[in-house]
Amino acid sequence: MTDLTGGFGVDFSFTSCAFASATYVERNAQLCHMVEHNLPLLGIDNAKVVCADAVDYLSTLDMQTMIFLDPARRDQHGAKTVMLADCTPDVVQLLPQLLKKSRFTMLKLSPMLDWHKAVEDLQGTVREVHIVSVGGECKELLLVLSEEIESELKVFCADLEAGDSSLSGGSSGSSCSSLSSEPSFPRTPSSPSASSTPSLSASLFVYAPGSSCPAPNSKLKTQNSKFLHEPNASIMKAGCFDELAAAYGVSPVSRNSHLFLSAEPVDGFPGRSFSIERVTTLNKRELRQALAGIEKANIATRNFPLSVAELRKRLKLKDGGDVYIFATTTAEDEHLLLISHKYQ
């Protein structure tokens, strides 16, 4: 494999372990010297360091199993860019060469990027999209390109948390089609030094955009639901709400709420689940009864006319505690507060 945007060598030090030989390419000579010094210390003896421009070196490459690129996300003035064509190097312009020179090309992109637009810009060559979140925040967007393998596009939504190294949430979350959760490109084996790094637990949901999914169950009403489910950051970035509802048998509160309901607990839901204790409108009398005994709460708004700060001021509640209040608007255009506690 070849990493054409080597940088500090962090990505390279992990990906290189999955290949018999690996090449680090970086035009900054100082970084090249640093990585050349660090690789033996990391126990990586299958790699070579090349100080060269990525575009120039690409033209000299023989066929590779994988080419990795993490294009610079700032323009010549230092401003952040989120459009694929504005990154350096321009992978859209380099696409024909990348496909010709490798079985797989992996792009590491800004989580702010519109991945649907990126897939479109890359002209049907994207085989996999990996959306990776850590601790509730979307951190990375990875695209895997190939002309060699013709298959439907798969989207992997991964959410990582510090903990044990188990995988929860099911290997393939989508019931819309029979999908394998295994990526089609080589995976990095465990590093010898893995024991020195924090272990992770991960929730994984896999789906195929455009697959025929059953319509989400909208019969379940907010007022008589017992459980509330909030998708994780990767699901939110993917926007796969119909697929999620079909896979787990949950009902959307409304089209734009991105909250889901169920009458029973849902095992392995990729996100947070809550038990609903009370449901109230903004009617003063109802609010007084529903909030009796509650002095502080964690408040979130989803498709709701008030901000969190405005609602907190109106409810006169402090921040924190074990009560969670979700303010949202139902499909019937009714503003409701769902007062809940974390489930398990």
Please place each PLM-identified region on the residue numbering.
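SAM-dependent transferase fold signal centered on methyltransferase-like domains
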Residues: 1-344
